[in-house]
C-alpha cells in the first residue's frame, strides 16, 4: 500500500520580494517628463496638474518642472509646476 507522509506546516511562510513603493521625487525637486514621482498601491496621492497616472497607480510627470504636494478637500494631490520658458 502506497503511503505519503504529511508535509510539515510552515511556521514563518515565504519571503516575498520588496515592492519599492513610496515617494520618489519630493516637493521642490526638479523632474523631467516621464519621471516617476510616486509608486503606490491605490490612490494615496492623486494626480494634479501636469501629472499622469499609470494603471498600477504610479504618478509620473507630464512636463518638466518642480514637484509640488498639496491637500485639497481631504485628498493629497501631486502637481508639477512648469519651469518658466526664457
Curated annotation (Swiss-Prot):
Q: Which InterPro entries does the record cross-reference, listed alphabetically?
A: Ribosomal_bL27, Ribosomal_bL27_CS
Renumbered to this chain, region (Disordered) spans: 1-21
Gene Ontology molecular-function annotations: structural constituent of ribosome
Give me the Gene Ontology terms describing cellular component.
cytosolic large ribosomal subunit
Domain of life the protein comes from: Bacteria
One GO term (biological process): translation
Keyword check for Nucleotide-binding: no
The record's keywords, sorted A to Z, are:
Ribonucleoprotein, Ribosomal protein
Instruction: State the Pfam families in the record.
Output: Ribosomal_L27
Give the Gene3D superfamilies listed for this entry. Answer: 2.40.50.100
Q: Tell me which HAMAP family the record gives.
A: Ribosomal_bL27 (MF_00539)
Give the family, as the similarity comment puts it: Belongs to the bacterial ribosomal protein bL27 family.
Could you identify this protein by its name? Large ribosomal subunit protein bL27
Organism (species) = Coprothermobacter proteolyticus (strain ATCC 35245 / DSM 5265 / OCM 4 / BT)
Taxonomy of origin reads: Bacteria, Pseudomonadati, Coprothermobacterota, Coprothermobacteria, Coprothermobacterales
Amino acid at each position: 500500500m502506497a503511503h505519503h507522509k504529511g508535509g510539515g506546516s510552515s511556521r514563518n511562510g515565504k519571503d516575498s520580494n520588496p515592492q519599492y513603493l513610496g515617494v520618489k521625487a519630493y516637493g521642490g525637486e526638479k523632474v523631467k517628463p516621464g519621471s516617476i514621482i510616486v509608486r503606490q498601491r491605490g490612490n494615496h496621492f492623486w494626480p494634479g496638474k501636469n501629472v499622469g497616472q499609470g494603471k498600477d497607480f504610479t504618478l509620473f510627470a507630464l512636463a518638466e518642472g518642480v514637484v509640488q504636494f498639496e491637500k485639497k478637500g481631504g485628498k493629497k494631490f501631486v502637481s508639477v509646476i512648469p519651469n518658466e520658458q526664457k
